Each structure stands twice: as C-alpha cells, then as structure tokens.
Amino acid sequence: MDIENDIRNRRIIRNISNLLDDDILCDVIITIGDGEEIKAHKTILAAGSTYFKTMFTTPMIARDLVTRVNLQMFDKDAVKNIVQYLYNRHISSMNVIDVLKCADYLLIDDLVADCESYIKDYINHDTCIYMYHKLYEMVHIPIVKYIKRMLMSNIPTLITTDAFKKTVFEILFDIISTNDNVYLYREGYKVTILLKWLEYNHITEEQLLCILSCIDIQNLDKKSRLLLYSNKTINMYPSCIQFLLDNKQNRNIIPRQLCLACHDTNYNVCNPCILVYNINTMEYSVISTIPNHIINYASAIVDNEIIIAGGYNFNNPSLNKVYKINIENKIHVELPPMIKNRCRFSLAVIDDTIYAIGGQNGTNVERTIECYTLGDDKWKMLPDMPIALSSYGMCVLDQYIYIIGGRTQHIDYTSVHTVNSIDMEEDTNISNKVIRYDTVNNIWETLPNFWTGTINPGVVSHKDDIYVVCDIKDEKNVKTCIFRYNTNTYNGWELVTTTESRLSALHTILHDNTIMMLHCYESYMLQDTFNVYTREWNHMCHQHSNSYIMHNILPIY
C-alpha cells in the first residue's frame, strides 16, 4: 500500500509539473528580471505561499482572469527556483541568500527553513561578517540572529580582520547599539570598536553623532575618554565635539515639544493638520496639513519625522497609503504603501522599524500585523494577533508592543469622535484583553485581562510599568482612572488614582515622570498631568483661537 501511495504521489506531482511546462490553464503571470515572464497557477502558488494566498483572495484581484505579479526586485534565477519549489520540484542549485530573501518576502516558511539550515551548516567564524552583511536587514529570521550572536561573541578577534575593515556603517551601528544583555559591551570597548573602524572608513557627521549617542560618555574610563576626545575624525565635526561636551554630566531625555495631529473644526472635520506644541508655554503653531483629507489614520514619530498611515476619507472606506512629513522643512514624502488597508489602528515604533497592527479594513476588523523598516521598498507580514482588534490602546516597552482593549467588530464610518474612550451604552464588542507582541521572537503573549472593556485608552510605559488611562462610568458619573501593571511581577492591574472626567478623548503621553493628558475642547487647550511618584494631579487650561479635535500626540526630542 505504501508503494502504491508513493507511486500515486509521484504521478500527481508529475501531472502538476506538466501543467507548468505546457502553460496549461495558467492564470497568473510573474514578471522577473529583464522583463522575462513566468506563467503559473494561482492555486499552486497560494498553496505554498501565504503572500500569494493573501493576494489572490483579495476581492479585486480574485475577479481577474489573469493576474500579473511583479517580482523584478529579486534575482530572476531565485524567483525561477522558488516557482519550481512551489510545484514540488527539486532545486538542484541556488544562490541561497537570494532565494532566502525572496522566500521570506513571499512567506514560504518551509523554504525559508531549508535555506536557514543550509546557511547554518555553512557559517563559521571566518564567514559570519560576510553573511551578516548580506542578511542583517532580515533580523526577524532566526538564522540572522544566530549569525549576529556568532559575530558578537567573536568581535574581539574579528575587529582585526579585513572583513571588519570593510564593514558598512549599518553593521558597525548595529554592533555598538545592541541592547542584547548577553553581548552588551562595556562602554570603553565600544570606543575601541569605533576607533578601529574609523581607521579604515569614512563617516559623515550625522552617522558619527548616531554612533556616539550609543556610548555612555559619562561612564567612560579615563583612557577611553582621552582616545575618543583626541580622535582626528571626531574633531572634524563640531556637533560631535559639542555632544561630548554636553554629555559630561547625565541629562534626562524628555520631549522638548509635542507634535499634535488634529482636525480643525472651524473649517471642516476632514481638514487634518499638524501642530507643534510647547509643553511649558502651552503655545502651538500649525506646521502642515495631512494629505487627502483623511481621518482615523495612525501616526508616529521616527527620528523626529512624522509618519501618517492608513485612515479613510469619504471616497475610500480604508486606505493603505503612508506618508513621512519632515517637521523642519514640512516636506511630504510618500513611503511604500501597507499591504493591508487600515483605519482605527496604531503604529508602534521600535528603532527604525514601524509596526502597523490590526485596525478596520472595510467591514472587517484585522488580526494582521505588518512592519516596515525605513529605507526598505516594501512592508512585510508578521504573525497574526490572537484576536481581531481596532481602536485599542498601545505602547512600546523594550522589545514588546502592548495592546490593551479595543473593538472586536467594525463600526460605521463616521467623523472623528470627541469622546472615544467612554462606553456610555452596553457594548459586547469591546475587549478587555491585554496582549503583547515580542518583536525579537515574533510571538504573541496573553497577559492578565484589564478591569473592563475599553476603547482607545491612553497607554504609556514608565520604567517597568505600563499605565492605562481611561474613562469608566459608574452609577453616578464618569471618572478618569489610571491603572498600573508591573511587567516584572505579573500581578495584574492596580487602580492608582481617579479624577473627574473632562468627557473628551484622552490623548496621553509620558513627559519626564508625569503622565500628561491633552484635550482640545471648543476654544480651550486643557492640560492635565499626574506625577507617578508623588501621585499628584495638576490641571491647566489655556484659551486659543481655533477649535480642534485632537487625534494623537507624539514626542519631539
């Protein structure tokens, strides 16, 4: 019986392969390098690739009789090999790095695992820098972490090799800025690595400033400090000299201003704009408008540039466009679009990688998560959330993205809500779940449930604690409550304090040791702060000329 099954299986594989060879019933055309085309079958490709499965089941594409897919950005031989692989054919020879990159993009997990196994057998002390050069941008893949561990553990000897002398700046920055406790170098040794690399490489002023910011100047030993201060390259750049002088004493890093993403209700609720707000004077200035009159988008700050993603306008139920806005020169740049259309979601930022999580897509609520690293030409899908969520609260702490509450079913497309954290009526579609995403190991974890279901709570992290700010309705009135969860003890949620609610959307940010809440109400800017140490509230009110509905607040350092 086993022999018969084996013969039958081989016959099925041969029949499928013949379809590819004979161009029979093909319904997808893949364009590769030099404009060459490969004809294939959606069903076969979707069976082995999550990327193709998602693409071909999208309603607009599913209606196409023949779908065209552009993979010209990858090595054409690698794409050919992958198509052969999906038709269950043996790959006789391959450039494993090119195949791995393409297989990872197409979400072909089995082939990625095969490539990782091949690389693991090949990698050694002499080749680890070369391989890391080729793959360091793919840090989400386990084999890349394995190569990095090998590199980091051997760096004392590797810095004398020709391979290290030719290392690109991005690898140097990755080595010195690592926050892996196992390979966390003492500050003096970071200086040794930097100065050795500077002997053989050119570096710009901006790049050198980035590297220096990864070194704790205050805790340098005397010898390392003298070597750093006397280096010719460092002394070429005034900003680097000033940085060293400014960091002789410890300085707290706190936002100097806030970026406010708002909607100007004096004109039109669909007229979004960006303000820069001075925390101390409570003064603000309009610096930009947001493209396409979108609402319920997600926003974030990366290197003090504003990222605007998704949302919707009344011509489109949801969008996938992404924009970057420079705060200084106000220039708008369109970035690669997200794979999924999203609104009522959040963007998390860890280092220079942006994560788009859940949200509403048409009449569906998404479980999907995708990420984009600045400088790349595409977004990539990551493991789905345990549940579908939109309008949740979110914050980042270390390598984790924390998600609190949210909606589990879609809501109709309406204008921006002035009150978006209060459940005034019973709603069974509001979640009290708390989950977090481990961006290093690419897994979701479930944490103790929140006290109650909540929509768009304010969430911030302070040291090892997560604070949630939300409005809760009791029998008499509505209170603004602050809850705390310690990430070390896992003891559940503690109610820290309550105060009278302002009945407006709670936009929350951590400023120094205080939780700051900003509200725009009619012609007033309201600023409430709560000190996490003294547990004291401070309420301030400032009148301004225009009327805004605030959508998000972001720190500018």
From Swiss-Prot:
Disulfide bonds: none
Residues of the BACK domain: 133-223
Kelch-type repeats, residues: 305-352, 353-399, 401-464
Annotated localization: Host cytoplasm
SUPFAM superfamilies linked to this entry: Kelch motif, POZ domain
One GO CC term on file: host cell cytoplasm
Keywords: Host cytoplasm, Host-virus interaction, Kelch repeat, Modulation of host E3 ubiquitin ligases by virus, Modulation of host ubiquitin pathway by virus, Repeat, Ubl conjugation pathway
Occurrences of domain BTB (ranges): 26-95
Main location: host cell
GO biological process, one term: symbiont-mediated perturbation of host ubiquitin-like protein modification
Function, as annotated: Probable substrate-specific adapter of CUL3-containing E3 ubiquitin-protein ligases which mediate the ubiquitination and subsequent proteasomal degradation of host target proteins.
Assembly description: Interacts (via BTB domain) with host CUL3.
Protein name: Kelch repeat and BTB domain-containing protein 2
Record organism: Cowpox virus (strain GRI-90 / Grishak)
Gene, per the UniProt record: KBTB2
